[in-house]
Amino acid sequence: MWTLVPVTFALRLLSTFVQPLGSLGSSLGPLFLWLWAAFWRAGGDRSRQQLQGKTEAGEPPRAQEDSHLPTTPTSVNYHFTRQCNYKCGFCFHTAKTSFVLPLEEAKRGLWLLKEAGMEKINFSGGEPFIHDRGEYLGKLVRFCKEELQLPSVSIVSNGSLIWERWFKSYGEYLDILAISCDSFDEQVNVLIGRGQGKKNHVENLQKLRTWCRDYKVAFKINSVINRFNVEEDMTEHIKALNPVRWKVFQCLLIEGENVGEDALREAEQFVISDEEFEEFLDRHKDVSCLVPESNRQMRDSYLILDEYMRFLNCRNGRKDPSKSILDVGVEKAIKFSGFDEKMFLKRGGKYVWSKADLKLDW
């Protein structure tokens, strides 16, 4: 009997508070719901801002996303020297230094790139055949194909310093040789800065085409369309040479390289409009191997390594270097490359680039 008294008393006491508490809960309920919804909206807004890249720092969406997602260096352009025997007026990688990495250090960097996912390496300059008469380049080409077993090894050259003996020693390890040719008019080549005294740039191009066929190297042509060649019709010449690709670039200005106070070139006189570039492309629309690249496509869609193996970020119209991959590794350095992988794929940056897969009729 006495044990039930406290329980009964407690139940009666609780019953006296049920109605007031219920009233309080019903009045506070909407307030709690409103606060919860407000916090949810605030969190949602922050999430949407992150997805859209609208940060307080005002960073663009690509920069915000790229800082968290690793970039694979599928295709890399290694400008291991800035030295050149030509003086092309629009050149955007000029001879500001004479530095070239020791061979073993260059190989170490290439090994790091391979481990990070590199499939294609393109050697450029400057003029890549100028250093050690092409032997340094040849050893890197052989290393990349034999030891790294890269699917594609290519070179961009003006062609003036290449000898047949180089093909005999290293041709089997090279997939693609791209030769720069901006005009089939020798007077225009002189105006541009590709004149070499008694040497004829066009005749040399034809000789190199023959060597590429003889030594089973895919032949490619690169042309920079500028004020002096924009009216030219190159259709018949290109068809006769029959390259696997004819890369056509719009003349590009880069602060500190070919425009501005610190530049070694003054390329403003070579610049053409987007409309003029489109007219040139339309004139050559029947050339099946034509691959055009406007300034917009070109600026952010290349992974460029300089002579110190630093990635060069060209997003702001100049070349801002990262730290060297030899010092900080590929993953850290590539975050500062400014590389736009979507544009790389959109411009056709990934194609059949191994001569084993090209199935050419040598």
Swiss-Prot record:
PTM summary: Acetylated by HAT1. HAT1-mediated acetylation of Lys-198 in turn recruits UBE4A that stimulates RSAD2 polyubiquitination leading to proteasomal degradation. 'Lys-6'-linked polyubiquitination at Lys-207 leads to RSAD2 protein degradation.
Keywords: 4Fe-4S, Acetylation, Antiviral defense, Endoplasmic reticulum, Golgi apparatus, Immunity, Innate immunity, Iron, Iron-sulfur, Isopeptide bond, Lipid droplet, Lyase, Membrane, Metal-binding, Mitochondrion, Mitochondrion inner membrane, Mitochondrion outer membrane, S-adenosyl-L-methionine, Ubl conjugation
Major enzyme class: lyase
PROSITE patterns: RADICAL_SAM (PS51918)
Compositionally biased residues, Basic and acidic residues: 56-68
Family statement drawn from the similarity comment of this UniProt entry: Belongs to the radical SAM superfamily. RSAD2 family.
Lineage: Eukaryota, Metazoa, Chordata, Craniata, Vertebrata
Annotated region (Disordered), positions in chain: 49-71
Reaction equations catalysed: CTP + AH2 + S-adenosyl-L-methionine = 3'-deoxy-3',4'-didehydro-CTP + 5'-deoxyadenosine + L-methionine + A + H2O + H(+)
Gene name of this polypeptide: RSAD2
Major localization class: endoplasmic reticulum
Topology of the protein relative to the lipid bilayer: Peripheral membrane protein
Regulation acting on activity, per entry: IRAK1 and TRAF6 synergistically activate RSAD2 increasing its activity with CTP as substrate about 10-fold.
Function: Interferon-inducible antiviral protein which plays a major role in the cell antiviral state induced by type I and type II interferon. Catalyzes the conversion of cytidine triphosphate (CTP) to 3'-deoxy-3',4'-didehydro-CTP (ddhCTP) via a SAM-dependent radical mechanism. In turn, ddhCTP acts as a chain terminator for the RNA-dependent RNA polymerases from multiple viruses and directly inhibits viral replication. Therefore, inhibits a wide range of DNA and RNA viruses.
One GO biological process term: defense response to virus
Domain notes: The N-terminal region (1-42) is necessary for its localization to the endoplasmic reticulum membrane and lipid droplet.
CDD domains: Radical_SAM
Cellular component, GO annotation: endoplasmic reticulum; endoplasmic reticulum membrane; Golgi apparatus; lipid droplet; mitochondrial inner membrane; mitochondrial outer membrane; mitochondrion
An example Gene Ontology molecular-function term: metal ion binding
Descriptive protein name: S-adenosylmethionine-dependent nucleotide dehydratase RSAD2
Note on how the cofactor is bound: Binds 1 [4Fe-4S] cluster. The cluster is coordinated with 3 cysteines and an exchangeable S-adenosyl-L-methionine.
Keyword 4Fe-4S: yes
Sites bearing N6-acetyllysine, chain numbering: 198
Induction: By interferon type I, type II and LPS.
Listed EC numbers: 4.2.-.-
Quaternary context: Homodimer. Interacts with IRAK1 and TRAF6. Interacts with FPPS. Interacts with HADHB. Interacts (via C-terminus) with VAPA/VAP33 (via C-terminus).
Domain Radical SAM core: 70-290
Cross-link (Glycyl lysine isopeptide (Lys-Gly) (interchain with G-Cter in ubiquitin)): 207
